[in-house]
Amino acid sequence: MGSASDSEVMNHCVETLQEHDIDFDIVVASAHRDPDKVRDWVLNAKQRGNRVIIAAAGMAAALPGVVAAYTDLPVIGVPMKSDLNGLDSLLSISQMPRGVPVACMSIGKHGAVNAALFAIRILLVNEYKKDEKPQGGLQQRDLFEHPWKKGGHPWNQVRNPRHLPR
């Protein structure tokens, strides 16, 4: 998190990770105020066993981009609400230059929960095998069933349905 003030929203991320028995670290470090701390933490993330990084930040929201600049691990950015209702954060995180990939979630609580769920999906990718359900973590239902899946959504009309989960 870029600031301790982000913890109220990011607790929703923490709870989601805990519900699925995912180990994680929590670090508060601002890309603007503590750039050396951010760099050192990110450069050692793989050695600590981190496989995905969720970075939450508000206003200028530089943290996710700075993190992505220092690692090849997947980085998920969570924009925090600010004076502009989080739009400044959302735009900062979503508009990364080429070569600095950051997955951008929605603003606030929903983004924090979705960041955790997306991180879990990333962690489970290696466990997927053709025509098999994921092992551990989330159930197939949790990952792919949506209220609109049974009818009408454009995903149901894709040309090559074998790529869609069943």
Question: Language-model segments: which ranges?
Answer:
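Short glycine/serine/threonine-rich phosphate/pyrophosphate-binding segments
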Residues: D6-N11, D34-V38, A57-V66, N85-L87, ...
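Structural motif
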Residues: D25, R51-I53, L73-G77, G99-C104, ...
